[in-house]
Amino acid sequence: QNKQAAETFYQAMMGDDAVAAFEVGRDDLTEGYQMLADFKIASDKANSGDKQAAEDLYLALSKNDDIAPLYRDLARLLAARNVPNSRTADDVIAMLVPLTQGSGPFQGLALEAAAGADVQAGRIEAAKEKLGQIEQLADISAPLRQRSVELKKILGER
């Protein structure tokens, strides 16, 4: 079954319409490939402007206990980065709380996204505080650290 799942996944990804192919061939996929297909479908929805569908798919992934916590956290982060216009900054920040207040590989990116939501809501000091928290994290990439420093400068902190 793994070989068939791999072949189905590969053919869908190489085709002209991966989303349609995944919907038709979903039963041929193993759980892992189904998860990857769901991420691809959500990404395509986001890229086509259907933010509501993308958010719904990412949130469903984030709540799926059958997939590893790392992927659930990634789905939560992507849901927050692809919210429809009807969502408020507070909605985004609330969505990110499990990532911003916990430790993990997405904490810095979640803090950055939450800071962006604060800026959108006009809460510049709260945004600068979150950006400062990023700089205190030990395990973040140099580009994320640099973005945090630059964003704080743009927001008026030297």
Give residue spans per PLM region.
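Soluble extracytoplasmic domains of inner/organellar membrane proteins
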Residues: 45-51, 55-158
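Extracytoplasmic/periplasmic/luminal assembly and interaction segments
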Residues: 13-69
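Alpha-helical tetratricopeptide repeat
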Residues: 2-12, 35-42, 73, 77, ...
